């Protein structure tokens, strides 16, 4: 602040939500592990995948740390950019977002290749009733297992490692419903699940790039309006893939096909037969609600940054893209920021 006194605008903590979401995720994770263990075939893959994820993320983050420092010092060390990634927290956030970019690019490619291999872009039926015996191809089950291990890892870091941001609870809810969708999709409606995974991972690539460009302070005419163009592209991709294609996919190719399959049965009977699928559709509606919420935030951010307050674009972008609390500073060390947050908690 101007007076030098640190403001204490920490994200509000809700103990009831903390306990509820933690129990929900832990129970679901235990159920997933137990079910895979009892099945036997994929449990070993889950364990190996979780170990690989932990090692790979650590290696990717170390590489991104080196690359980020070098790029910032070599190409952005001027008066306008100010070597942005030389600051401790800016580099940390760049690395955190960078491994997300690597993850989303890798899995988008993996999912795309599987979709092409099995020709699921051709409009074939992608919903199966619970009465049908459907065995998902091993390659697809392996993909879902790898996704599950990543959601285990992300949830652990979200709760126990990362600093809480303003959308902490929204992201926690997102982790819960995504884990549920990944687990149940691998058994029955893996075709629908794979398409939905692809839509999510592919659209996240553009958001990752947007956040990383913002951390590097690449904006304006001298940087060829790169971040401004990326912002527009991110909005368009989000609208098409998450707000348009996603609901059409699970409504037209999921719900409507199910209702047609059980034509003449009352809804209560359909629910008894397909209660798992109905719950997963509920999870998809939760995801869709989160997509609308984040889209509104993204539009508001763009309006403030480019229309109403363009002179404060970097502060607005920092708050919006990165979700910082007011006690976090890019210029301070992690230890100083932790002290600042602790002093705020003592005064709350």
Where are these regions (language model features)?
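Basic side chains
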Residues: 211, 242, 345-347
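Alpha-helical transmembrane segments and their membrane-interface exit regions
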Residues: 199-210
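Catalytic cores of secreted or luminal carbohydrate-active enzymes
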Residues: 293
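Membrane-helix and juxtamembrane interface regions of eukaryotic multi-pass membrane proteins
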Residues: 9-191, 214-239, 244-286, 296-341
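Short, small-residue-biased leader/transition segments that mark boundaries at the very start
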Residues: 2-10, 345-347
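Classical protein tyrosine phosphatase
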Residues: 195
């Amino acid at each position: 602040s101007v007076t030098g006194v640190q403001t204490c605008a920490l994200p509000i903590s809700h103990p009831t939500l903390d306990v509820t979401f933690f129990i929900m995720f832990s129970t679901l994770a235990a159920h997933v592990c137990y079910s895979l263990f009892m099945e036997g075939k994929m449990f070993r893959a889950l364990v190996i995948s979780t170990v690989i994820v932990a090692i790979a993320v650590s290696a990717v983050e170390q590489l991104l740390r080196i690359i980020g420092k070098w790029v910032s010092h070599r190409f952005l060390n001027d008066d306008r950019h100010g070597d942005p990634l030389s600051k401790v927290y800016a580099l940390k956030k760049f690395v955190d977002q960078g491994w997300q970019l690597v993850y989303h690019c890798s899995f988008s490619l993996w999912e795309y290749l599987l979709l092409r291999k099995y020709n699921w872009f051709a409009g074939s039926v992608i919903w199966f009733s619970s009465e049908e015996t459907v065995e998902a191809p091993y390659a697809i089950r392996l993909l879902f297992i790898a996704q599950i291990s990543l959601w285990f890892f992300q949830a652990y870091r979200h709760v126990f490692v990362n600093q809480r941001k303003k959308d902490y609870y929204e992201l926690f809810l997102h982790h819960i419903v995504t884990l549920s969708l990944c687990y149940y999709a691998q058994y029955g409606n893996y075709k629908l699940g794979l398409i939905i995974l692809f839509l999510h991972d592919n659209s996240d690539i553009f958001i990752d790039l947007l956040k990383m460009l913002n951390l590097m302070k690449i904006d304006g005419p001298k940087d060829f309006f790169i971040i401004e163009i990326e912002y527009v592209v991110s909005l368009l991709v989000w609208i098409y893939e998450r707000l348009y294609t996603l609901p059409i996919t699970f409504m037209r190719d999921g719900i409507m096909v199910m209702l047609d399959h059980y034509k003449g049965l009352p809804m209560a009977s359909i629910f008894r037969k397909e209660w798992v699928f109905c719950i997963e559709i509920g999870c998809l509606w939760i995801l869709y609600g989160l997509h609308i919420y984040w889209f509104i935030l993204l539009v508001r951010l763009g309006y403030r940054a480019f229309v109403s307050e363009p002179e404060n674009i970097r502060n607005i972008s920092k708050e919006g893209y990165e979700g910082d609390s007011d006690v976090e500073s890019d210029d301070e060390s992690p230890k100083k920021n932790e002290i600042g947050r602790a002093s705020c908690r003592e005064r709350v």
